[in-house]
């Protein structure tokens, strides 16, 4: 770690820079009154930039574009936040700059009419709104004697980048601008692919890999300065995901020198951003998994691994072109999205699997056999899907427009349509599937106790559930002892498959407003807490309100025989129909990583999951005793990081309900 990196890391961790910020929200509704929707969004971006004061953190801040306001201007006519979970066309941005994209929009004006013209003018005005803050930062850099930064800002981001540093500076500006444009969850996409040409440009004029690594580390640090402002559900849920490796659009292996530089930078810095994702396949050598495990060992909760062999065919089955499918990345958490040409909403809704089982269980007495009950559960899954898709389409009937983001999403300018109005090539939606393992375990328990053993009647089971198992502890223990997903048991694993496929089938034929499809997934996001809160006790022995499993993982009440059995369970069926995203999530005791043998076993476990057809996996290196102490004494653990669902955050900054869930997850050792 160089001195420059150490200095910036110290500034980040001290957090004194936060004292430079101004607070409060300015209402600018009167200033935008009378403007059309496109011009209003452009004006709001201009006003947000105008409120910022160029600020550089110490003598080694080579990027700037740090937030000095904690809130963007408010407009009562703007009903929602900007578009999120979209990957921009970074290749075009880096090669042509803002001015090149603006010129493209100006050229399209020649034959534009009506709303097309309004849209293109909104794009042009949004891009022009960037000029002032760029120039003010350039002047500030000159005054402060930052010759390198000042010179770079004379070129980028208005024009194309000529070096690795200028490309990084363009990216930092875009992160800053997108947040001021009200966009949330703006991932960084396939960083080692679109940055490779600029790495090579710098190498060709004498830059060393150590110098490139230093720039990369300084860039990574810069992404962490304002994460307390860029909130999702919790601090850390900010969408700064980065994808490394994987197949190129031409079908070649995309891993390159930058892949390793990024992994090394993340390992050395030990920060929550950017969240690293590795694309792999059945041909990936064990050495890659061992390299990833060294990063997991740091307790960062990443890398997350994605299986090209499963994901690419699944995306093609949903209608994505092969080249585009090969170029997939991830959204803020783990949803699979396209790079630079899509307006997909991969987290549009969330199915509550145990809710469907709860509704079916109330009618259990009407079922003559288990097959009838299974069909009833599937019917309830479909009914819930029907309602969720209907509600969502009503909610998104007239979303706010976003000409700024539209400028960087392929086809929008050429089609003369906003990204929120079908301008992009792809407009698909995704639906999460929360509590899948809990639902499968509950259905399994009903089969075993009600239909096979006949040791409990439907009325007795429903009475126990209604009572939240108060006075029914013996029955609850018997339900908990029933077979569970995660133990390589064909019964619950087969039921899990049936429920997953029922979900996928229920979404077939559903369309989005712009002709897209709905994609089923195995993720839960925060619904493992929120959705669980509205469902009563369930037949797996879970009490009312108790948390579900996180995404695609064994339930919290499952007694598991070991990590390999869990891997076998969750790779026991073809995951392509439910490949919207949602990782197999597993917790391994941090003691495992104290020797080389434990690291090798962890790497082998991840490889086994991928080789068996798993779609996505993430690992937490945790220590329950340490987490309990951190919960009691947060001041002693300011830098303790955990994987929450699709993102990593500082444990001490999480709400207690999310802390509790991480603590309750199974903690594996290798025998």
Regions found by a protein language model. Name each.
Residues 1-122, 148-158, 163-671:
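Conserved catalytic cores of very large enzyme subunits
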Residues 144-145:
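A conserved hydrophobic secondary-structure block that centers on an alpha-helix together
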């Amino acid at each position: 770690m160089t001195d420059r990196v150490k200095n910036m890391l110290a500034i980040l961790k001290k957090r004194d820079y936060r004292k430079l910020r101004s607070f409060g929200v300015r209402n600018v509704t009167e200033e935008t009154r009378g403007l059309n929707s496109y011009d209003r969004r452009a004006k709001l971006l201009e006003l947000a930039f105008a409120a910022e004061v160029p600020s550089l953190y110490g003598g080694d801040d080579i990027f700037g574009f740090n937030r000095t306001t904690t809130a963007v201007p408010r407009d009562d006519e703007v009903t929602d936040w900007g578009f999120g979970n979209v990957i921009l066309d970074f290749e075009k941005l880096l090669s042509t700059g803002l001015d090149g994209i603006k010129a493209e929009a100006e050229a399209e004006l020649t034959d534009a009419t009506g709303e097309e013209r309004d849209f293109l003018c909104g794009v042009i005005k949004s891009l022009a709104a960037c000029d002032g803050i760029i120039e003010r930062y350039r002047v500030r850099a000159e005054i402060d004697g930052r010759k390198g930064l000042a010179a770079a800002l004379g070129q980028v981001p208005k024009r194309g980048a000529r070096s690795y540093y200028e490309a990084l500076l363009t990216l930092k500006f875009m992160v800053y601008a997108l947040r001021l444009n009200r966009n949330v969850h703006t991932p960084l996409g396939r960083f080692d692919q679109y940055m490779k040409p600029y790495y090579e440009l710098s190498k060709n004029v004498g830059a060393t890999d150590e110098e490139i690594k230093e720039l990369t580390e300084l860039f990574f640090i810069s992404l962490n300065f304002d994460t307390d402002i860029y909130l999702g559900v919790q601090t850390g849920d900010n969408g700064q995901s980065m994808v490394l490796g994987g197949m190129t659009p031409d079908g070649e292996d995309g891993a390159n020198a930058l892949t390793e530089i990024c992994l090394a930078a993340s390992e050395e810095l030990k920060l929550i951003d950017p969240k690293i994702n590795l694309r792999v396949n059945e041909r990936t050598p064990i050495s890659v998994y061992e390299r990833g495990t060294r990063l997991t060992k740091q307790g960062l909760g990443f890398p997350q691994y994605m299986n090209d062999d499963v994901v690419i065919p699944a995306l093609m089955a949903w209608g994505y072109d092969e080249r585009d499918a090969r170029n997939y990345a991830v959204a803020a958490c783990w949803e699979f999205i396209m790079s630079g040409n899509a307006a997909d909403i991969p987290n549009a809704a969330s199915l509550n699997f145990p809710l469907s089982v709860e509704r079916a269980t109330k009618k259990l007495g009407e079922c003559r056999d288990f097959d009838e009950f299974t069909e009833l559960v599937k019917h309830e899954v479909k009914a819930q899907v029907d309602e969720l898709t209907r509600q969502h389409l009503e909610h998104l009937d007239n979303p706010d427009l976003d000409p700024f983001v539209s400028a960087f999403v392929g086809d929008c300018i050429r089609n003369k349509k906003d990204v929120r109005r079908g301008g992009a090539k792809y407009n698909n939606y995704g639906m999460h599937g929360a509590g899948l393992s809990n639902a499968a375990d509950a259905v399994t328990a009903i089969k075993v106790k009600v239909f096979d053993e006949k040791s409990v009647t439907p009325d007795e089971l429903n009475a126990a559930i209604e009572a939240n198992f108060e006075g029914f502890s013996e029955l609850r223990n018997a339900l908990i002892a029933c077979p569970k997903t995660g133990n390589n048991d064909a019964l619950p694993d087969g039921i899990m498959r049936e429920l997953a496929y029922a979900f996928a089938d229920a979404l077939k034929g559903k369309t989005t407003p712009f002709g897209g499809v709905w994609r089923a997934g195995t993720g839960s996001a925060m619904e493992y807490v929120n959705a669980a809160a509205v469902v009563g006790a369930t037949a797996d022995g879970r009490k009312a309100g108790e948390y579900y499993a996180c995404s695609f993982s064994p339930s919290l009440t499952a007694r598991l025989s070991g990590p390999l059995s869990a891997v076998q369970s969750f790779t026991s069926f073809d995951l392509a129909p439910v490949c919207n995203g949602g990782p197999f999530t597993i917790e391994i005791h941090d003691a495992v990583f104290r020797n080389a043998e434990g690291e090798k076993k962890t790497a082998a476990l991840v490889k086994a999951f991928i080789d068996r057809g798993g779609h996505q996996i993430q690992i937490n290196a945790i220590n329950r005793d340490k987490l309990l102490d951190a919960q009691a004494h947060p001041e002693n653990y300011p830098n303790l990081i955990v994987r929450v669902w699709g993102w990593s955050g500082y444990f001490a900054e999480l709400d207690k309900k999310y802390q509790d869930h991480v603590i309750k997850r199974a903690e594996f050792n290798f025998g």
